[in-house]
Regions:
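NAD(P)H dinucleotide-binding glycine-rich loop of Rossmann-like/cofactor-binding domains
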Residues: 79-82, 91, 118-195, 316-319, ...
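Mid-domain Rossmann-like dinucleotide-binding core that forms the NAD(H)/NADP(H) cofactor-binding site
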Residues: 163-247, 334-404
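Glycine-rich beta-strand-centered segment in the early N-terminal region that forms part
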Residues: 42-59, 73-120, 135, 160
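ADP-ribose/adenylate-binding Rossmann-like module
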Residues: 268-271, 284-301, 425-430, 441-460, ...
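Rossmann-fold NAD(P)-binding glycine/threonine-rich loop
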Residues: 275-278, 294-313, 437, 453-472
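C-terminal hydrophobic helical "lid"/dimerization subdomain
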Residues: 2-17, 246-256, 260-261, 265-282, ...
Length: 580
């Protein structure tokens, strides 16, 4: 370990008199910093309940672009006047503790390395780091109760000694990817909730409800068969009957019985009309469920709110037996890619799509065939360069498809590659409802469709919900992450089953932050851009350019030009200047 790198890691040096930072004073690039440059600020003194931290690395994200474009009108800035109360971008952050307030001495220590979990809530309100709370595009700043005392506790994750600075920052985007394959949906009837059971009129089928009917506090029955009425009356729940309802009356009873919040759990028995199912689906509460139980397909595709699948975690489930409860539970409702099968990633050429592909290829029990779509031939070539060797290394196959230039349709391509079976899993990485709906058409009847990218609530699309109860198809979506998701990425990195550093495509010093954000707008680099705020005079440079421009750093890159801890050490040895 070089002397400069050793001093940097230990934080045993005199702090500088000032810290440089990129404040955001409004919408637009012209409001980032002062005159297009970072500003100097005095390094603040920490109170008894605060940490003074050094920012080591910051990943640049398209979410930063959204904040830059919207300014104070961004949903997580609550119409703040940024010219008076500026914020600071940077939510993918790795940091080192410099000073510890005396009330925190038992929890933190100088030199401790941490990653930020930025998806912060306080009293149920989003106060995200890098949004509401000024973020990491600075050299030093204070951390207090706004990060340490949140609804989820302290939003700081201690780093393993083997973790590099860049890969520690990238735990955040990688955590979002991992979260897409963890169970976010509620899969059992809600305790104390409101359940609505809808049956076709004059139905005498002897349905059962082997477990879970004792959970709701209120059960609403609409044209329920006698068997269900009997089961409901045997519970402690309040039972309400509303029969002979037309679809235009559904919203009225939702307002009456749920204050417009929607039903926590809805059960539809022997559904036949896709239109009716679609109308009912609009009334699912946040994190609510719609359980379809029947043996015959609907009369068409169902219009589903794609935004709510992603942001509200609504769950569609079902089965073809007479036991309503057979639809519930994690065993029946998967969230992970199928081992040894086929996974399709739609719009996979961007940094996040690349992470999904990498995870699938490195997953020990991952899919055997990975299909990636992208409309840019340049990005497709990047995917080939990055992942063809990785696929070969893990004895997997990767196929690439450009729908704009191919002679066959996307569906025909997938069907040809899967012997007309369709894909087991389809992950949509771009926020376009048409592509989300198209993803449903290439899926096996028992496949899984994952909406990783979000579209606004109210964005509708047609899907085949008959497959939910006839074949156990899954429809899922996720937004954000937890600190446990970041921790799981670190655990896999330590175990050698995931390489976050492979996502790094370009690096830069503090002064390049604005250019780095512009590069994301322009899709200039084929992966993540990482800023090192403690380094001055480092231009924004792609890893492909290092061989010619910084050969001593390039020499430390890993296979396939992967960013490594050794490259990071060489970078710090060359550029970091210990404060005088």
């Amino acid at each position: 370990m070089g002397e400069k790198y050793k001093a940097y890691r230990s934080v045993k040096y005199h702090l500088p008199q000032r810290s440089w930072a990129w404040n955001l004073y409004g919408a637009g690039m012209e409001n980032m910093g002062k005159n297009g440059e970072p500003e100097p600020f005095s390094i603040p003194q920490s109170s008894d309940d605060q940490l003074l931290v050094r920012i080591d690395s910051v990943g640049v994200c398209f979410s930063d672009v959204k904040i830059l474009k919207q300014g104070g009108s961004h949903p997580k800035l609550y119409n703040r006047n940024l010219s008076v109360e500026p914020t600071r971008l940077g939510h993918e952050v790795s940091l080192t503790v410099v000073k510890v307030g005396k009330n925190l001495a038992g929890e933190f220590q100088p030199g401790q390395r941490l990653a930020v979990q930025p998806d912060i809530y306080q009293n149920g309100i989003s106060t995200a780091y890098g949004y509401t709370i000024p973020g990491g595009l600075a050299q030093y700043h204070l951390i207090g109760k706004e990060v340490l005392e949140t609804d989820a506790g302290a939003c700081l994750l201690p780093m393993h000694d083997s973790m590099g600075y860049a890969e520690s920052a990238l735990l955040e985007p990688w955590g979002c990817v991992v979260a897409a394959y963890t169970q976010r949906r509620r899969l059992d009837p809600k305790t104390g909730g409101t359940m609505w059971i809808i049956g076709p009129p004059d139905n005498t089928t002897e349905f059962t409800f082997s477990k879970g009917l004792d959970s709701p506090a209120t059960i609403v029955l609409t044209d329920a068969p006698p068997s269900i009425k009997k089961l409901a009356s045997a519970t402690q729940a309040k039972v309400i009957e509303r029969n002979n309802l037309a679809p235009d009356g559904f919203e009225t009873i939702s307002r009456e019985l749920t204050d417009g919040k929607g039903f926590d759990d809805i059960v539809m028995l022997n559904p036949t009309s896709a239109n009716v199912v679609g109308q009912v689906a609009r009334l699912i509460a946040r994190r609510g469920t719609l359980n379809l139980v029947g043996a015959k397909p609907l009369d068409g595709l169902v219009q589903v709110d794609f935004g709510r699948l992603h942001y509200d975690y609504i769950a569609f489930m079902g089965n073809a037996s007479l036991d309503i409860a057979a639809s519930y539970g994690e065993e029946r409702n998967r969230c992970e890619l199928r081992a040894g099968r086929t996974a399709v990633f739609v719009g996979a050429g961007g940094p996040m799509g690349q992470m999904h592909i990498q995870r699938a290829l490195e997953l020990p029990d991952g899919p055997q065939l990975v299909i990636a779509t992208e409309i840019s031939d340049e990005r497709l070539q990047t995917l080939s360069d990055m992942f063809a060797p990785l696929a070969e290394k893990h004895n997997r196959t990767i196929l690439l498809f450009n729908p704009n230039t191919a002679r066959q349709s996307f569906r025909d391509f997938v069907m040809q590659a899967t012997q007309s079976q369709g894909a087991d899993d389809v992950v949509v990485c771009v926020p376009f409802a048409a592509l989300m709906a198209e993803g449903d058409t290439v899926m096996k009847p028992d496949g899984m469709l994952v909406f990783f990218a979000g579209v606004p609530n109210g964005t509708m699309g047609a899907v085949n919900l008959s497959n939910v109860y006839l074949s156990n198809a899954q429809y899922t979506g996720t937004s954000g992450l937890t600190i446990h998701d970041q921790a799981s990425v670190m655990e896999r990195r330590i175990a050698g089953t995931l390489s976050p550093g492979r996502s790094v495509a370009a690096i830069g010093g503090l002064e390049t932050a604005a250019d780095a954000i512009q590069s994301v707008i322009d899709s200039k680099y084929p992966g993540k851009v990482v800023i090192f705020p403690q380094i001055h005079n480092l231009p924004l440079i792609s890893l492909r350019e290092l061989k010619d421009r910084l050969p001593e750093v390039a020499a430390k890159l890993g296979e396939d030009m992967m960013w490594t801890n050794e490259a990071e050490e060489a970078l710090i040895e060359k550029f970091w200047q210990e404060p005088a």
